């Protein structure tokens, strides 16, 4: 594949030098089926699945973004991997390797539900290991695990909901721009931003945020039965916690490096020589560590752009519209540092 890519790029530069032809070389490849990769050796029997949940948590259809090409949503990726794990009788436990600030409320909720269903259908234990961060929606997902462990430098917590609604009415008055909105009811454009919110409209949105916050608390209480509801409300004011603080507050079970978590899981399931596997989509990358990424993102496309003088080859075509998904969530379980 690398040789073919080098040859294709050579053709691009030759064509560009001649200025007489258009060349369009797509370098965005559709995802392939998942393949099993061993990241820690062991016996040929019991397996522990190491499953990544990283970055901003998303749901919905596959999207194409600049520089990285096609990418599935977090929910699709996790659901696909869990479905594959269900069919493997040698898998004895799952470790969620989480490194995320959170994301959309629905994405967080769907991920939580996927893990919960997997546990119910398979009877297998699930552990969560938080790395750099496991905040807000990422912590929401972690509560679906049987045990939660944090790296010594992990940032976690940030339990709560956030939503932002820019208001442009005052700015429009200053620059002489007015947007006429025709609507069927006073609250139809409540989040439109072209007119300032009224107090009653803020109450409507705050009520929705409060409801989603209660859902977050319920998930934590279900996953952390040792926590009292009153205690949780005191600590769930949106603040973040260090690893040690999260253990003291009862949000997590201990401070462990990922390798120590895996050893702990082996002991729990009675498989001291159990091997650790991941699922990935391509065969281009070697996996020699439990800290290696489980996915390789395809590269972006090399499009063509005609010009009046001949042929122009754009090696990087950045579509700003693709930086935002088609359907953005309104409410977030996310930490905004």
Task: Locate each region found by the language model.
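Short gly/pro/ser/thr-enriched loop/turn and capping motifs at secondary-structure boundaries
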Residues: 135-136, 155-159
């Amino acid at each position: 594949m690398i040789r073919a890519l080098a040859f294709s790029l050579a053709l691009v530069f030759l064509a560009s030098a001649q200025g007489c032809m258009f060349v369009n070389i797509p370098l965005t490849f559709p995802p392939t089926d998942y393949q099993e990769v061993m990241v820690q050796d062991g016996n040929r029997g019991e397996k522990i699945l190491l499953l990544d949940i990283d970055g901003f948590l998303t749901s919905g259809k596959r999207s194409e973004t600049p520089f990285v090409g096609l990418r599935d949503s977090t929910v699709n990726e996790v659901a696909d991997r869990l479905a594959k794990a269900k069919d493997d009788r040698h898998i004895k436990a799952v470790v969620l390797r989480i490194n995320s600030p959170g994301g959309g409320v629905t994405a967080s909720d769907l991920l939580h539900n996927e893990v919960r269903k997997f546990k119910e259908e398979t009877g297998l234990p699930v552990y969560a290991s938080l790395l750099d961060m496991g905040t807000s929606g990422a912590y929401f997902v972690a509560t679906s695990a049987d045990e939660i462990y944090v790296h010594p430098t992990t940032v976690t917590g940030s339990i709560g909901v956030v939503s932002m609604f820019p208001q442009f009415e005052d700015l429009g008055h200053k620059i002489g721009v007015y947007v006429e909105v025709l609507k069927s009811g006073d609250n139809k454009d409540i989040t439109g931003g072209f007119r300032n919110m009224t107090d009653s409209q803020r109450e409507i949105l705050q009520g929705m945020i409060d409801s989603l916050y209660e859902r977050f608390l319920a998930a934590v209480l279900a996953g952390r039965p040792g926590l009292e509801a009153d205690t949780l409300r005191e600590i769930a004011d949106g603040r973040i916690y260090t690893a040690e603080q999260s253990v003291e507050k009862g949000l997590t079970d201990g401070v462990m490096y990922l390798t120590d978590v895996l050893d702990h899981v082996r002991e729990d399931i009675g498989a001291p020589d159990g091997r650790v596997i991941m699922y990935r989509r391509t065969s281009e990358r070697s996996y020699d560590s439990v800290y290696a990424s489980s996915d390789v993102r395809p590269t972006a496309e090399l499009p063509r752009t005609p010009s009046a003088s001949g042929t122009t080859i754009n090696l990087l075509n950045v579509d700003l519209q693709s930086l935002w998904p088609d359907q953005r969530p309104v409410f977030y379980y996310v930490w905004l540092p």
